[in-house]
Amino acid sequence: MSDKFVAIGDIHGCVLTVEKLLEDIVKQHKDRKFVFVGDYIDRGPDAKKTIDFLIEFSKSNSCIFLRGNHEQMLLDFQDGVSSIGSWQRNGGKETYLNYMNEKKKFELPYQHYHFFRNTRLFFDSAEFFFVHAGLDPECSIQESIINEQ
């Protein structure tokens, strides 16, 4: 028997919405694997709480977390690859403020950094291929993966 998946994307810091959605799904379907296809942060009000919730949810549910462009922008900023301007122009201001410490400095908890860093670029099951974005319609899936790496 093949796996049954629930794919969820573009939460964008809306933790209350995703909590309610997942509560309803879990009540009805106990045997699902959850594939979150990225964009957990930015634009919405509660990026930090969203990540806390997803980490906690994954402790009792089968979850696969993919990286969206918003997580990549946060990692690029955190790792010093790009400036904050690019990230904030693309909705990162709310997330930046969520992670500000009492000294008004950006502080990403290690557990959250680890979560972002360990997201996958894609997930390939026996029947489905999951990705946030970036596949070239002119190429096969294999060629697109090779080009991205």
What kind of feature is each model-predicted range?
Residues 1-53:
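N-terminal active-site segment of His-dependent metallophosphoesterases
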Residues 1-6, 123-129:
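Beta-strand-turn-beta hairpins that frame and shape the catalytic cleft
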Residues 6, 35, 64-66, 129:
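Hydrophobic/aromatic beta-strand patches that form the interior of the parallel beta-sheet core
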Residues 10-12, 69-70, 132:
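Histidine-centered divalent metal-coordination motifs
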Residues 13-16, 124-126, 133:
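Catalytic core of the metallo-beta-lactamase
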Residues 19, 75, 140:
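A short local structural element in Rossmann-fold oxidoreductases
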Residues 43-126, 137, 149:
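Active-site neighborhood of divalent metal-dependent phosphoester bond hydrolases
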Residues 139-145:
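Cytochrome P450 core scaffold surrounding the K-helix E-X-X-R motif
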